């Protein structure tokens, strides 16, 4: 009895606990497929009722795998080509260098415009064709030496570039006229004596000094000639006026030549040199350069370099500045004189 009584209350407690646990648990919701909507940045996004099919993802995976395989194959082929190309380059080095030299030497050769080749430029001064990265600043010249030579040629506008002969025909006429006007007094002395009589006597070189009696006679003759001129222009000349005119003509005949010491040493040196500059020897060139103003020190350099007349006519500004270490000012003056010799 005791066991029955003792065991009987146990199920009652268990049932009480079960009822209590059932009351305490919240009701579970049934999971059903629902269509959800999202509102993101002004867009209404609605989810699908069914998931995406699985076969589509497999196709995407297959495409990605095939692209990876093709990429690996291309890399392998490129590595094989890279190994073969150096061997071919070693075998054909001589042929490629010869062809490149022919392209650079032949004028007007078309430049190679390959897809992988960098662009090439041509120097405006020396005509050298080279890659663009080797050209400096303005991309016009291949080196600083070419740029400096171009600037020197532009400042003087002579020497480095040969202008058209048709453009030089008109200025030569003016140059010849200037040379005629620059004739030295020694050349005028050797001219016709009739022209010398017409020329007025310079006060620097007067004729022989007359005696006091001759001065009185000449004064009286001048007074008589003035009176005769004022009286009438149609009257014949008096013997006094005729004698005065004769004395003046004699004075003009007795005019002494101009003093050679007061002449320009440049003109004197050029008069003693041969007329053709190409026939000058080293000493003639030395005398010519020494006679120029401010070029006495440079003349020794011309003698040391053994420059004759033909070499003198071939000189340029860059030769004078670079080879002979002459400053810009004397070099430009000297080149101007050389250009005058060329034109003459």
UniProtKB/Swiss-Prot annotation:
Residues 280-344 form the SAM domain. Zn(2+) binds at residues 123, 126, 142, 146. A zinc finger (FCS-type) spans 114-148. Residues 1-23, 216-233 have a biased composition (Polar residues). Its main location: nucleus. One of its GO terms (cellular component) is nucleus. PROSITE patterns: SAM_DOMAIN, ZF_FCS. InterPro entries: PcG_chromatin_remod_factors (IPR050548), SAM (IPR001660), SAM/pointed_sf (IPR013761), Znf_FCS (IPR012313), Znf_FCS_sf (IPR038603). It comes from the Eukaryota. Component of a Polycomb group (PcG) multiprotein PRC1-like complex, a complex class required to maintain the transcriptionally repressive state of many genes, including Hox genes, throughout development. PcG PRC1 complex acts via chromatin remodeling and modification of histones; it mediates monoubiquitination of histone H2A 'Lys-119', rendering chromatin heritably changed in its expressibility. This is Polyhomeotic-like protein 2. It comes from Xenopus laevis. The lineage of its organism: Eukaryota, Metazoa, Chordata, Craniata, Vertebrata. The gene is phc2.
């Amino acid at each position: 009895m005791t066991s029955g009584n003792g065991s009987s209350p146990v199920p009652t407690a268990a049932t009480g606990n079960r009822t209590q646990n059932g009351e305490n648990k919240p009701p579970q919701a049934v999971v059903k497929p629902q269509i959800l909507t999202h509102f993101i940045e002004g867009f209404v996004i609605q989810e699908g009722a069914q998931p995406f099919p699985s076969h589509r993802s497999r196709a995407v995976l297959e495409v990605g795998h095939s692209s990876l395989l093709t990429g690996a194959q291309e890399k392998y082929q490129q590595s094989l080509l890279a190994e073969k190309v150096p061997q071919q380059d070693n075998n054909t080095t001589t042929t490629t260098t010869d062809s490149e030299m022919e392209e650079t030497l032949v004028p007007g050769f078309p430049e190679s415009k390959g897809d992988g080749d960098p662009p090439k430029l041509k120097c405006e001064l020396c005509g050298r064709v080279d890659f663009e990265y080797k050209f400096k600043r303005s991309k016009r010249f291949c080196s600083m030496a070419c740029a400096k030579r171009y600037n020197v040629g532009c400042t003087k506008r002579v020497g480095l570039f040969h202008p058209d002969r048709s453009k030089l025909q008109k200025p030569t006429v003016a140059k010849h006229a200037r040379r005629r006007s620059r004739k030295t007094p020694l050349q005028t002395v050797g001219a016709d004596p009739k022209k010398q009589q017409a020329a007025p006597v310079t006060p620097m070189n007067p004729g022989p000094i007359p005696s006091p009696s001759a001065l009185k006679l000449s004064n009286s003759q001048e007074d008589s000639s003035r009176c005769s001129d004022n009286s009438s222009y149609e009257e014949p000349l008096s013997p006094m006026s005729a004698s005065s005119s004769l004395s003046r003509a004699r004075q003009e005949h007795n005019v002494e030549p101009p003093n050679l010491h007061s002449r320009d040493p440049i003109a004197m040196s050029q008069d003693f040199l041969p007329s053709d500059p190409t026939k000058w020897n080293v000493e003639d060139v030395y005398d010519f350069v020494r006679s120029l103003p401010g070029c006495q020190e440079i003349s020794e350099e011309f003698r040391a370099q053994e420059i004759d007349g033909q070499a003198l006519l071939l000189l340029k500004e860059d030769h004078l500045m670079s080879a002979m270490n002459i400053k810009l000012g004397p070099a430009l003056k000297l080149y101007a004189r050389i250009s005058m010799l060329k034109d003459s």
